[in-house]
Structures are given as structure tokens and as C-alpha cells.
Amino acid sequence: MTATQYTNINSEYKNNGQRLEQIARFNLTGEIAKADNRKATECGDCLGYQIKSARATICKGENIAAHIESDAAIAYIYITAELVAYTMSKAEYLEFATEFATLTRESAKNGGATKMRFKSESRAMLEWLKARA
């Protein structure tokens, strides 16, 4: 796992996940591009990387390992509120996601499906990342 301090940009997004994905895309490519919603099986969010942040959806259902196994990403980037990007392998990401995931349920209006999401960013999460970078 590696840690990289990213440069902030004036993002157009109010949604934190989209804002951080746009910042990550800028730091990876030098271009300001819109965040998009690609399927995990297609190739990742940017240059083969899956980009995540606090409260991001990890997968539908409860099987994180099966989701990561079917994911076409070459690596994973978790970007913190302080814009530190932690780049992880599939194995590291599985360990991280398993440790800091929480099971949520969509509203009945939206079908009531379960999904795994990252918890809010915490001191424990940041310490876990720093200890492994």
C-alpha cells in the first residue's frame, strides 16, 4: 500500500464521493473530468483504479470478497478527507473493506436491498491506513 498527498481542485460537486473522485481523477490524469458510474466489472473508475471514500458503497449484498473477485480494477484508491490517497491491491482492499464496512439497507421505496458501505472516516480507519502505508 502506498500513500500519496493529492492536490485539491475547485470541484463542482457537492456530493463528497463525487468530489473526491474528481480530485483523484485530476491527480491521476491532469484533467478535470466528471465523476461517472461505471460498473465494477468494466475497468474501474479511472485508469483501472476503483476510487472510494468514506460512506461509499462497496457492493450490493453482503459478499465483499465475491464482489472484489469479479471487479476488473487493477488496484483500489481510498481517498481521505485530507486528500491522502491510499492505493491498495485487491488483497489489501479486501482486508480494509472487511474491517471498515457496515451493512445498510435501502429504503422500501428503493427496493429495500442490502449493501455494504464504508463507515464514516474515523481515527481508527486513518490509523489502520497509516500503519500499512
Give a label for each model feature.
Residues 1-133:
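Nucleic-acid endonuclease domains
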